[in-house]
């Protein structure tokens, strides 16, 4: 409870100040880089204030000078605020389309090239999201996606959606798999309470989409890489048969 309160206090104290000053400045100059850096600093400060320690490895696996698609398992609402500030440069994320309709903030999100997604949307809307993500990659940004599509209900790696792999094959952007563990016990699904602990972030060797003949082969390779890096209790139920 106290950890959640500390995180909330940091965000409530610093977030509005950054927004009041940063968003108008960003809209005026047409460059979101400074606001993004401030937002990442505040995000990281809140995480650490909540008593969350971060153990990260594998940053050397990010291909230099190339826009990447980071693909991570998803076990907690803490995953994005723990992970994104650690990634170099700027990263775009996929978010609910409705958030883009918020006055001023929505415009800033569009400037940041965040990608709007409609859950359960029709085919053309999904294709529009893929196109927007491709545009973000071509502009030099990274993309962070959770190919499971939602948080795992039990902490184990779930099945993957095909959309992110279509994006990877279309753009030929390297995929950097990420294995996240620890956050599933710090903020469980369905709860807002935070329990201090250690979040372990493992960035794995990059996977080149062009090395795979089909989307299914690429998806299998990424899922296998993440599964292999997760602790036993988080490996998928089909782990023993995945490589067969």
Walk through the language-model features, giving the residues of each:
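N-terminal membrane-anchoring alpha-helices
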Residues: 1-55
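Non-catalytic C-terminal accessory region of glycerolipid acyltransferases
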Residues: 5, 127-244
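Catalytic core of membrane glycerolipid acyltransferases/transacylases, capturing the structured
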Residues: 18-35, 49-50, 64-122
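Short, basic, glycine/proline-bearing loop/turn elements
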Residues: 43, 115-119, 149-150
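Short gly/ser/thr-rich secondary-structure transition/capping motifs
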Residues: 50-57, 126-127, 183-185
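Short acidic-hydrophobic, aromatic-tinged amphipathic segments that line or gate anion-handling sites
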Residues: 56, 115-117, 209
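Glycine-rich helix-loop-beta junction characteristic of Rossmann-like nucleotide cofactor-binding loops
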Residues: 59-63
């Amino acid at each position: 409870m106290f950890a959640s309160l500390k995180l909330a206090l940091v965000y409530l104290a610093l977030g509005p100040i950054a927004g009041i000053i940063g968003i108008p400045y960003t809209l005026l100059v047409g460059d979101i880089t400074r606001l993004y850096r401030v937002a990442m600093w505040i995000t990281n400060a809140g995480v650490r204030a909540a008593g969350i320690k971060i153990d990260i490895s594998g940053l050397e696996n990010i291909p230099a000078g190339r826009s990447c698609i980071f693909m991570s398992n998803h076990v907690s609402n803490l995953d994005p605020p723990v992970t994104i500030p650690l990634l170099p440069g700027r990263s775009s994320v996929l978010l609910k389309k409705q958030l883009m309709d918020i006055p001023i903030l929505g415009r800033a999100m569009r400037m940041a090239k965040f990608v709007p997604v409609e859950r359960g949307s029709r085919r053309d809307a999904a294709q529009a999201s893929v196109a927007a993500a491709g545009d973000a990659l071509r502009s030099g940004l990274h993309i962070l996606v959770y190919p499971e599509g939602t948080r795992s209900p039990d902490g184990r790696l779930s099945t993957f959606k095909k959309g992110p792999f279509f994006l990877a094959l279309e753009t030929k952007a390297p995929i950097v798999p990420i294995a996240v563990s620890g956050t599933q016990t710090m903020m469980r699904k369905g709860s807002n309470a935070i329990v201090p602990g250690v979040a372990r972030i493992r960035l794995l060797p990059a996977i080149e989409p062009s090395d795979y003949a089909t989307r299914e082969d690429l998806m299998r390779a990424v899922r296998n890489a993440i599964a292999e890096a997760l602790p036993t209790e988080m490996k998928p139920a089909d782990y023993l048969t995945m490589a067969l």
